[in-house]
Amino acid sequence: MNRIARLVVLALVLLAGTAAWAQPAPAGKNLTVGILLVGPYNDHGWSQATYDGLSYAIAKVPGTKMVYVDKVNPADRPGTTASQLAESLVNQGAKMVIFNSDDMSDEAVKFATAHKDIFVIFLSGDTTWKEGKNFHDLPNMVCIMGKMEYMKMIAGVAAAMTTQSGKIGFLGPLINDETRRLAASAYLGAKYAWVNYRHQPLSKLDFKVTWIGFWFNIPGVTSDPTQVADDFFNSGYDVVISGIDTTEAVAEAAKYQAKGQTVWAIPYDYKDAINEGRGVSLGVPYFNWGPSIAVAAKAAMNGSWKSHWEWNGPDWKNINDPDKSAVGFNKGTLSKDAGAAVDKFIAELAKGLNLWKGPLNLQDGSQYLSSGQAATEKQIWYLPQLLEGMQGQSVSK
């Protein structure tokens, strides 16, 4: 074999090796999809939204079936890691594994690296975003997130149009880039409605964030979200926007209203979380994971899979379209004026209204966006602090 021929053979061998890692073999006509849920599958919040999203995909994509493990967190499963539990899904036949929490980031990367033949979806992550801060070259992984920022803005509008005291509380989970930007989005929506729809001075809007320390209550570890919600209501905050995975805010609002106190709440994540407090829930910003998971499953089956990062927005023709919109807002008990304001705001967003535009300062007074400057995706995704005008911690102590 001459030198040129040897080089050609070597190149083909290297290419074949690269291709094997570049894309797992297509699953073909049948695909078992496993999902790891950080909380209970029926938590009426984040985990149920992702569980239902996969259920939607299974119903839409012939040849697929589902296996799952829930309560994947240190409190419920001490000494057990997410990657170990992912192994258990593979042992049940899973050729695709979904990690459903930002808290699983390191474990998702560890598992994907060790299982190059398994398709991996990391919900809410950025590890496959080439321009992001946490990029890993993982050809078998796709990261998916919905642009919840829009829906949190809508929640802020609903809160600002409803509050009688001008005091809005935000019940936050742990502090990270995601939770900062979502709390800030709610503030931006509230600020916009307070000034432009209610024509009130911004100085009279009180927006306070209290973090509990995790996505849901872990007795003895986190602050109790029930107590935090109560503290808001007992301190004159008459609307509480939830940023945690579970429904304590709206449950407490219902209790307070039953005792004669006029308060409201806005749950999160799951479309039907609104049912936890009929009459006190102003609406719920929710994720609709099904369509994007269905697309990923089809790609894994037919060989069109490519590693990428996606940050999916709403379908502005109908933000609640179950087959097209990645995020939505399920309106609740809103006054006529508040409901009209929410509809008006959604229409403005659909036409291009951008609240992530300067002038905007960070909480410490430093400039975030100059006048007229629109934030980039990176500036929003990696928001380093809360915004000026918001009360509460910006970083973990």
What are the residue ranges of the model-derived segments?
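Bacterial N-terminal signal peptides that target proteins for export
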Residues: 1-9
